[in-house]
Design a protein with these regions (language model features):
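ABC family nucleotide-binding domain
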Residues: 1-137
Length: 137
């Protein structure tokens, strides 16, 4: 399966509550991609749908040109790090953001500018050198 992720008109409901309604996005292979939003807006729900842990009530999910709506989680060949374990307590904010790039063997001279851009985008550049236990929320 291709590493590109394509989502068209994703819908997820929990009873009468609609958690996602018509979400569409394209994540290109190798793209540095982040889901940002307030608590309860559907970020984790969408990730769980991509990973195959949550059912899909509507829309189409693709890895490359292969539709994966009915592909079981164990056959999707992807991983998911759950929220509580996604941050390394011994690393700074900057190093936590850089971790995924280093793990993918991105050249060192490209990592700092990409991390700086991501921190600036989410307006936390001033927190770059703090450890997780020095942050709130």
């Amino acid at each position: 399966m291709s590493n590109q992720v394509i989502i068209r008109d994703a819908v997820k409901r929990y009873g009468d509550f609609t958690a996602l309604n018509g979400v569409s996005l394209d994540i290109r292979e190798g793209e540095f991609f982040t889901l940002l939003g307030p608590s309860g807006c559907g970020k984790t729900t969408l990730l769980r749908m991509i990973a195959g842990f949550n059912s899909i009530e509507g829309g189409d999910f693709y890895f490359g040109d292969k539709r994966i709506n009915d592909v079981p989680a164990h056959k999707r060949d992807i991983g998911m790090v759950f929220q509580n374990y996604a941050i390394f307590p011994h690393l700074s904010v900057r190093d936590n953001v850089a971790y995924g790039l280093k793990a993918r063997h991105i050249p060192a001279n490209e990592i700092k500018p990409r991390v700086d851009e991501a921190l600036k985008l989410v307006q936390i550049s001033h927190l770059a050198d703090r450890k997780p236990n020095e942050l709130s929320g």
